[in-house]
Amino acid sequence: MLKVWEPQAFLEFLNRRRTEFYPEIEAQVRAILERVRREGDGALYAFTRQFDGADLEATGLRVTEAEYREAEAAVSAAFRAALQVAVENIAAFHRPQVPTSWFTTRPDGTIVGQRVTPVDRAGVYVPGGSAPLFSCLLMTAIPAVVAGVPEVIVCTPPDRNGRIDPHMLVAARAAGVKDVYKVGGAQAIGAMAYGTATVPRVDKIAGPGNYYVTLAKKLVFGPVGIDMLAGPTEVMAVDDGSVDAEWLAADLLSQAEHPNGMVILVTTAGPERIAAVGAAMARHTAALPRAETIRRSVAELGAALAVDTLEEAADLVNAVGPEHLEVGVADPWAFLPLVRHAGSIFLGRWTPEAMGDYIAGPSNVIPTEGTARYASPVCVETFIKRSAVTCYSEAAFRAQAPHAVRLALTEDLLAHAASMQIRLAKPDGESPSEGREAG
């Protein structure tokens, strides 16, 4: 079921795929964003009719309290219990990430430091489609709440009846979300970036989406911050034959059931192992309701690569920079130091990637398409910023300002130099008010 690649040929294929441009899609996204910027809610209603088949003008874009109450009554006690475990684990993982402001005084009396503050309002995008991805909501909104963001909102597309899945709404309340808006696609990104009469403008947008959503995030960046450019999902499994082939096959299929999901197997156990895992994938697929999506994903983006050593496997991992990395080897902790580029790493046979999707604690909103080379999963840091703080005493200023003046003059920035020279011209200990009176 998996296409066998020669490693270098696969890396070349991957690089071509990751560097493709889609100017026709960019033109469509730009047009959507511009219409949202100009027309606000009117554009959102029109696009929701066009793309989601829902007419919301009578009921509005914002989820009402009545809808939250209906959702609470609709979900099972078992779901509530599982949700609570997930919420607790996600919050517990992210709390230690919260940084503190700090200040230090140098020997000359200068005080320097950093003041850490959250953004005022965060916008979370949750994809729609055939499944209610409330896990993405939890994994994005909870880090924002833990970071201290005063207001977190969510945009997600409605169904054809103009409703949001009740599990999504219950998850939103459990995560601490203020409001949910029935808006999806690139138009949702535009609404959160520019603001409309209903959807407030946010300071940071986070969450995954399809190519249209990802491109919209890229285009609005600047006036609003974004977490990353997170595209279709990926999983890469490093294997030495020590994990049951049936288990490994099931793990790979867990990502293939997403449209355009990429699955990569790197094994040191030879062609027979690839055949065994592929056969197991075929058997599992036949019994799954999303079999058609899985077969398409695997046919287009499934790959198996045979290597001789785990060191070679690690080189491939670092070249790919996968979103999800499963390390199914006899000693996963010995392999871990070899990994430099991977979004989220799952060690050992009892750690299927799907545990990370729902309940382990780290966010499942993770860099894709090789961006793990420089980017990180959504976390508390996504929603905070640092302000540098500096305070000179007079003595410290007089000691160091001449050096700063020399540097400013060397850059030929005379006004910079003058702002320091005007202070140096004052007699020691004379306040500005004393100087004015003397003049």
Curated annotation (Swiss-Prot):
What keywords were assigned to this record?
Amino-acid biosynthesis, Histidine biosynthesis, Metal-binding, NAD, Oxidoreductase, Zinc
Gene Ontology molecular function, alphabetical: histidinol dehydrogenase activity; NAD binding; zinc ion binding
Question: What this chain does, per the record?
Answer: Catalyzes the sequential NAD-dependent oxidations of L-histidinol to L-histidinaldehyde and then to L-histidine.
The protein depicted here goes by the name: Histidinol dehydrogenase
Q: Which organism is it from?
A: Symbiobacterium thermophilum (strain DSM 24528 / JCM 14929 / IAM 14863 / T)
Which NCBIfam families does the entry mention? hisD
> In the UniProt entry, which residues are flagged as the active site?
E323 (proton acceptor), H324 (proton acceptor)
The family classification in the record reads: Belongs to the histidinol dehydrogenase family.
| Residues reported in the UniProt entry to bind Zn(2+) | Q255, H258, D357, H416
Binding positions (NAD(+)): Y125, Q187, N210
Lineage, highest ranks first: Bacteria, Bacillati, Bacillota, Clostridia, Eubacteriales
Q: Which reaction does it catalyse?
A: L-histidinol + 2 NAD(+) + H2O = L-histidine + 2 NADH + 3 H(+)
A GO BP term here is: L-histidine biosynthetic process
